[in-house]
């Protein structure tokens, strides 16, 4: 090989090396850009995943809040119904307590009346009908007359007016009812 050929070969090698260096530089720039884009994408993905987790946590928290609110509303509705029911029962009991003396007085009037007297018969019938109407109206509202006569005395339910000994009754037995109760 001649000198000239060597120079041409050397020059070709130099050009080839320069082209490779240039390709490597271009490849490196592309790699850098690609890596930067990949890093940006990874950062964006991480950011979106964090936002998703935060959103899911918020949704779960709001679902829990909704469930608690529903439970609270249900509890409030139940408590309100119970309070209304109690108030209704209390009002009914108070009303019945006020009617009991009227019913007792009508019963006393019936017992005291002379059923044989023709002059008293129409009046007695009116009192009996009034008594029956009162008892029917009170029973419509679920109240029943309690007559403990002949039953054992219960201090939770009965009020003793007097104590008497009787050979016909056992000890601690209600012998006579002065004022009836309703339940």
From Swiss-Prot:
The keyword Protease does not apply. One of its GO terms (cellular component) is cytosol. Residues 1-20 are annotated as: Disordered. Keywords: Chaperone, Cytoplasm, Stress response. One of its GO terms (biological process) is protein folding. Residues 1-14 have a biased composition (Basic and acidic residues). InterPro entries: GrpE, GrpE_coiled_coil, GrpE_head. It is found in: Cytoplasm. One of its GO terms (molecular function) is adenyl-nucleotide exchange factor activity. It comes from the Bacteria. Participates actively in the response to hyperosmotic and heat shock by preventing the aggregation of stress-denatured proteins, in association with DnaK and GrpE. It is the nucleotide exchange factor for DnaK and may function as a thermosensor. Unfolded proteins bind initially to DnaJ; upon interaction with the DnaJ-bound protein, DnaK hydrolyzes its bound ATP, resulting in the formation of a stable complex. GrpE releases ADP from DnaK; ATP binding to DnaK triggers the release of the substrate protein, thus completing the reaction cycle. Homodimer. Belongs to the GrpE family. This is Protein GrpE.
